[in-house]
Design a protein with these regions (language model features):
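Surface-exposed extracellular loop regions of Gram-negative outer-membrane beta-barrel proteins
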Residues: 49-53, 58, 110-115, 119, ...
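Solvent-exposed, glycine/polar-rich loop segments of beta-barrel outer-membrane systems
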Residues: 2-10, 62-69, 122-127, 222, ...
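Feature captures outer-membrane beta-barrel proteins of Gram-negative bacteria and organelles
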Residues: 160-162, 189-204
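Transmembrane beta-strands of outer-membrane beta-barrel proteins
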Residues: 41-45, 100-104, 174-176, 192, ...
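Solvent-exposed loop/turn segments connecting transmembrane beta-strands
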Residues: 154, 158, 181-191, 213
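Outer-membrane beta-barrel channels and translocator barrels
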Residues: 36-39, 93-97, 169-171, 199-203
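Transmembrane beta-barrel wall of Gram-negative outer-membrane proteins
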Residues: 1-13, 17-37
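Outer-membrane beta-barrel transmembrane domain signature of Gram-negative proteins
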Residues: 15-28, 47, 59-173
Length: 238
């Protein structure tokens, strides 16, 4: 009750703030598959969106003193993704123990990410002094370090791959694959994979694989930003 972050006139016995989250997910997917000229194909288009909002209850903004509200809209996070995909495959006879399967595909992806700022009193520094912002979860601010962080961020990614899978003998399987990725914000890369499986005797198999990899940071990792202000010996520190 006597904590410097409390206002006894509002909570004479102290308080326990609560973080309430409201999450909404939306998605839609459509696809079609078939076979033509020996090629099996599968095409799809999908879209999804996630919205998470934060509402703080049983709290206060100490810097507004007894005039502080006790519930705050601290803002939220929004993410969406649109994905178009096409995969094809067919079996061909190269004279090995089994037919060789050739697979290929292409994909286009667009992503967006946005921070929704909280209401001003959820992060503001009021006239009464003390710890500013909603206690336990200050709202997202629209500007941090002189830069706006509430703008929608987006990027697109184009990729393609080809893969071969064959049984050289009844006991030896080999696989090889190439994949190309091109991100609008992070550049491009070409990766490969080789794998094999050898069964010297029935029921015993040896596997080995080697590959390279590439992973671009997510939009959330690049653009998520939040700021809180603390009162340390009468000095406000972000």
């Amino acid at each position: 009750a006597n904590d410097a972050r409390n206002v006894p006139a509002i909570y004479p016995n102290g308080f326990l703030p609560l973080i309430n989250t409201d999450t909404n997910d939306y998605s839609a997917t459509a696809g079609v598959r078939g076979e033509n000229g020996g090629w099996r194909w599968d095409a799809s288009l999908g879209w999804g969106r996630n919205e998470t909002d934060f509402r703080i209850t049983n709290s206060l903004n100490r810097s507004f003193g007894a005039a502080s509200q006790t519930e705050f809209d601290s803002g939220g996070l929004q993410y969406s993704q649109t994905l178009a995909n096409l995969d094809v495959s067919r079996d061909i006879n190269l004279g090995f123990a089994e037919k060789t399967t050739i697979s290929a595909g292409a994909e286009y992806r667009r992503e967006t990410f946005q921070i929704r700022p909280g209401e001003p009193n959820s992060y503001a520094n009021g006239p009464a002094g003390g710890a500013p912002g909603a206690q336990v979860f200050p709202g997202f601010q629209p500007v941090i370090g002189g830069q706006r962080v509430d703008q929608e961020r987006d990027r697109n990614n184009k990729s393609a791959y080809v893969e071969i899978d064959t049984d050289l003998t009844s006991r030896l399987n080999l696989q090889g694959a190439l994949r190309y990725e091109d991100y609008s914000d992070f550049g491009s890369d070409l990766n490969w994979k080789l794998a094999g499986r050898f069964e010297p005797i029935e029921g015993v198999a040896l596997r080995a694989s080697a590959s390279t990899g590439f992973r671009a940071p997510s939009l959330q990792q690049q653009f998520y930003a939040a700021q809180a202000t603390n009162n340390v010996n009468g000095i406000l520190l972000d």
